[in-house]
C-alpha cells in the first residue's frame, strides 16, 4: 500500500518480473567502460519516471504490451544493456554482453493520475510502488542493468519508471535509448534515427595521465558532521515557478538580477538554505558540485550516438559561515565558478585522475551535488500517448538534488527540485526557503562587490 498524501491510499498489483531480451541475436563479447563511466561515484542506480494521460486515439492499445515489444527491438541495437557488468584487473568495469535481458514489471494501480499530480509532484513519495525494487536486482555487478515498470491507472493514464545502472550512461545517454524505444512504439522500422555508438575508449585515461586541474570534488575530508545530520533522511519536492524565481532574484543586487541564469539563482538559494539548515560549524568548508555535461564543448568532440557518461562534477569550496551569513550573491558566484570549470580538458583530467588515484569516490563531507535534468529531454519522450505530464528525476539522494521540468495545474511552467535531508534539517530548510521565496521589499543595496575565493 502507498499513501500520498496521508489521506490518499492506493494499491498496486504487479505481475511477476520478467526478463525482456533483444528481439534478435546479438554479439557475445566483452566491452570495457570508459574511465569516466566506472568511477566509484557512479556505481549506483538512478531512477527516472514519466506520467502519461489517457489518449483517445490510442484506446484499446495496452502501453505495457507496446513498450515491452519496442524495448526488445531497441535492445537489439543497445544490446550491452541486456548484459551484465563484471570487474577486470584493478576493478575495471566491463560489460559481458550475455543478452540475459532487462527486468520488466507490468502493474496496475487503483488510482487516477490526477490524484498523484497537482500543483506539484513528489514522485519520491510513491516511487517504491511505481518502481518495485526486485530483490537481488539492486547490485552493480552481475545484475540487470535496467529495471522498468509500466503501471496502468484506472483513468487510462499510466506511468513509465526506469532504474538505470549509472555506470552505463548519463541521463542524455538514457534519453537517447528511450527515444529509440519511443520510435519503435510509434511504428518505426529498421535502425534508430540516431544509431548507438559504444566507443568507450573515447574517454579512456591518457598515457601517460595528465591532471592539470585541482579536483576539489574528489578531495577526501575527515567527517566531523553532527550526529543529527546522519539520522534518518526524508524526501520532499519543491516547485519553483516564475513567482518564486522572481522572489529569489529580488535578494540579488540589481546588476545580477537580469544577468544571472535561473540555474545560478536557484542553485545559490538552495545551497544557502541547505547550509543554514544543516547548522554547520561556520569554519567548516563546504562544496557545491554542479553536474555538467561535456557534450557540446568545443574541446571535446563527442561522437554522435555516444551514450556513455560524459559528465563531471566540478566544485567550488567555501566556508559554511560565509555561505550562511553573506548576501545571496556570494553563494551564486561560487556556483558560477564551479560551472565555469567544466571543459573537455577538465573531463579528460577527471579520467586521468580516476586511473591515477584508484577511482576515488567524490567528496561526501560537506558536499552538495546538483544535477539539472530540465533540458535532457525526458519531458519529450512520446511512446504514442503524447508528451508526458511529467518526465524527470524520481528521487533525490542525501548529497544529490535533481531538477526537473513541471507544469502545475494553472499551466505555469516551473522547476521541481527533489531534496533529501535529515528530518530536523528539512524543517529548517523549509523555513529558510520561505524567507527566500516570500515577498521581498526592494531597497537600496548596500552590498559591496563580492569576490569569491575558494578556501582550501
From Swiss-Prot:
Residues the record marks as active site: 166, 382
E.C. number: 2.3.1.-
Keywords, in A-Z order: Acyltransferase, Transferase
Expression by tissue: Expressed in fruit.
Gene Ontology molecular function: acyltransferase activity
Reactions catalysed: 3-(methylsulfanyl)propanoyl-CoA + butan-1-ol = butyl 3-(methylsulfanyl)propanoate + CoA; ethanol + benzoyl-CoA = ethyl benzoate + CoA; butan-1-ol + benzoyl-CoA = butyl benzoate + CoA; 2-(methylsulfanyl)acetyl-CoA + butan-1-ol = butyl 2-(methylsulfanyl)acetate + CoA
Organism superkingdom: Eukaryota
Keyword match Transit peptide: no
UniProt record similarity statement: Belongs to the plant acyltransferase family.
Function text: Involved in the biosynthesis of volatile esters which confer kiwifruit flavor. Alcohol acyl transferase that can use a wide range of alcohols as substrate to produce esters. Exhibits benzoyl-CoA:alcohol O-acyltransferase activity.
Protein name in the entry: Alcohol acyltransferase 1
Source organism of this protein record: Actinidia deliciosa
